[in-house]
Amino acid sequence: MRLTARILASGAAATLLLAGCSPETTGTATPAPSGPPSASASANPAVPKVAAPLDVSKYVSKPCDIVPSSVLSSLRFTNPGHTQLQDEELGAAGPGCGWKISGEGVSMQVIIGTGNRDRGAGGLTGLYGAHESGQFPFLEPAPDVDGYPAIYVDKRDRRPIGNCVMDVGVADDVAINVYAGGYEGAEDSCAAAQKVAASIITTLKGA
């Protein structure tokens, strides 16, 4: 399976960038913001800053490696991930990787939002700007991930139906979008997304 256009026209959670697509697809992430955030968004005091930026460059060419296989296995994703490298269409938000559990409709996707950064719409600032412009009507702070700020962001809040879209700021201009879809509800989908997000921070700290 290849990451869908909906994911990445992502127009990536958040990112990647990243968010909101339909629950009928095997997966979706936050679509990329359509343009640079406005000056008011850039200065928005609600946008959390990243105190200790992390370097994602090592994983831009191999985004599937950013999530440890042990973490994926613990979530029952045993099939290889499917890579979508950045391009002008499907990968506009940045490079990503998708996994699925065969026969269950459960999926996990990650997008590294370097494409959003390069367009001047990167990081949580870009997502807050997209929220303010109405592109992503739903945005809510999420628990920090190992000290890194995070948000839930989507076209609408789909957590109750088992689709959790979150973005974690790893630098002020780069966010990583994590999408967990096809779960029973908000608790299990967001727990899975948070577990993957935490493993990504651990990976980046050790890179």
Give each language-model segment a name.
Residues M1-G11:
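Bacterial N-terminal signal peptides that target proteins for export
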Residues L17-G20:
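C-terminal motif of bacterial Sec signal peptides marking the signal peptidase cleavage site
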Residues T25-P31, G35-A207:
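A small/polar (G/S/T-enriched), proline-flanked helix-loop surface module common
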